[in-house]
């Protein structure tokens, strides 16, 4: 395995490096559909955030997910921080998790850092391949119209 180290200039004082490390403490990582399903089933402190826009209204969604449209996402950051305050992990996704999902995850991470939000959120993740990949890999989906989805879609689609 190759590892790359990023060095910091010697002129930086130790305190400056520590402060920078604190600002970068919340990073965004990716999680596979299978791993997310296992996490969500075993840990009630996982929140799934769907940032698709109108697609959610005519496509299925991940059971129990919360909808925060990417179009109004920035304005709803305080609401999202409150809604996920008791969660260890928050996982974002859009259709493919190439633009909206990662962008919203980064925006949320930055918001928590900038506002010093005392939230329980420790891990901010993005679902690999997004909702389309989730569905294509055979993971359970929900077609309810509840807002927010309660995750009780049908007997063969267990609550997450």
Swiss-Prot record:
Name by which UniProt lists this protein: Arsenate reductase 2.1
Function description: Possesses arsenate reductase activity in vitro. Catalyzes the reduction of arsenate [As(V)] to arsenite [As(III)]. May play a role in arsenic retention in roots.
Residue positions of the active site: 94 (cysteine persulfide intermediate)
CC annotations in GO: cytoplasm; nucleus
Pfam family, one: Rhodanese
UniProt-listed Gene3D superfamilies: Rhodanese-like domain
SMART domains per record: RHOD
GO MF annotation terms: arsenate reductase (glutaredoxin) activity; phosphatase activity; protein tyrosine phosphatase activity
Species this protein is from: Oryza sativa subsp. japonica (Rice)
Residue ranges constituting the Rhodanese domain according to the UniProt record: 42-143
Annotated keywords: Oxidoreductase
Induction behaviour: By arsenate.
EC number: 1.20.4.1
Keyword Metal-binding among UniProt keywords: no
InterPro entries hit by this protein: Rhodanese-like_dom (IPR001763), Rhodanese-like_dom_sf (IPR036873)
Reactions catalysed, as given in the entry: [glutaredoxin]-dithiol + arsenate + glutathione + H(+) = glutathionyl-S-S-[glutaredoxin] + arsenite + H2O
UniProt key word Calcium: no
């Amino acid at each position: 395995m190759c590892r790359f180290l990023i060095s910091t200039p010697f002129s930086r004082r130790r305190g400056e490096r520590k402060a920078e490390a604190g600002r970068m403490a919340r990073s965004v990582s990716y999680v596979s559909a299978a791993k997310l399903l296992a996490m969500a089933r075993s840990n009630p402190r996982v929140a799934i955030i769907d940032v698709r826009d109108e697609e959610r209204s005519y496509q299925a969604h991940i059971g129990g997910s919360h909808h925060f449209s990417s179009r109004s996402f920035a304005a709803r950051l305080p609401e999202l921080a409150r809604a996920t305050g008791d969660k260890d992990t928050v996982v974002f996704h859009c259709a493919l998790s190439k633009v909206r999902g990662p962008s919203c995850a980064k925006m949320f991470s930055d918001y928590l850092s900038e506002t010093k939000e005392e939230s329980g959120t420790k891990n901010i993740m993005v679902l690999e391949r997004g909702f389309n990949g989730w569905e294509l890999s055979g993971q359970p989906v929900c077609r309810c119209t509840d807002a927010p989805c309660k995750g009780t879609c049908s007997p063969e689609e267990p609550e997450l």
